[in-house]
Amino acid sequence: KLPDRLVEDFFAFFDVVKTPIAIRSSSLLEDSHYQPFAGIYSTYMIPYLDDKYEMLRMLSDAIKGVYASVYYKDSKAYMQATSNVIDQEKMAVILQEVVGTQYGDRFYPSISGVARSINYYPINDELAEEGTVSLALGLGKYIVDGGLTLRVCPYHPDKVLQTSEMEMALRETQTRFYALDLKNTGQNFSLDDGFNLLKLPVKEAEADGSLNYIASTYDPYDMVIRDGIYPGGRKVITFANILQHDVFPLAEILRLAPKYGQGEVRRPV
């Protein structure tokens, strides 16, 4: 049971935050410089509700679920593989607003990503120190779980290997995405932190109108992929309007963010 003294703080937090909330870990091992530990512990997301007591119940379950994930079989196996022990671990839990837009009974962002300041597999004109980014439609769990994302070097945003050939673009780009189910109020709370997430086909996002700046359209008659959304034809997640036509300065942001992060911690991030 969580301390009663936290209830008032949580209600004050609910009054300020009007979006879904992510409940995630922040531990000593996750901040380690010498081995990756991100994604080992659970991260839960809960919808925003008008009933603050229902939100408090969901939040309480999620916080306990995050702490409990330290003792899961997979977590302990990873600790052993990296020569760590549970006794050395210390953890805080962070509450963050989930970035995105509500579409009916689901909530998700148009863009999520994971950036690395070192590119271990540079190709063509890329340099290792230029870093690399994995981009996807929907919640970032799709990336963390190893989904088919778009690999981009922010210094060469117009040169994406996966979209360099039509057959490759159709075969090796994202076809599904994660969204938060706003109807699920945690009555079926599970140790699986994805219990209230929906894994949907990209065509569902097309119906939501969330692909305008991130998708291209495959024309089966002319056998080409055209940047932008057009009637008919399969929608391909290329981020072309953003990466190549600079509708939004994402490439510049992705050049600066890892650079600043690496400068602050004095190590690759």
Which role fits each region the language model picked out?
Residues K1-V269:
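Conserved mixed alpha/beta core segments that line enzyme active sites in large multi-domain catalysts
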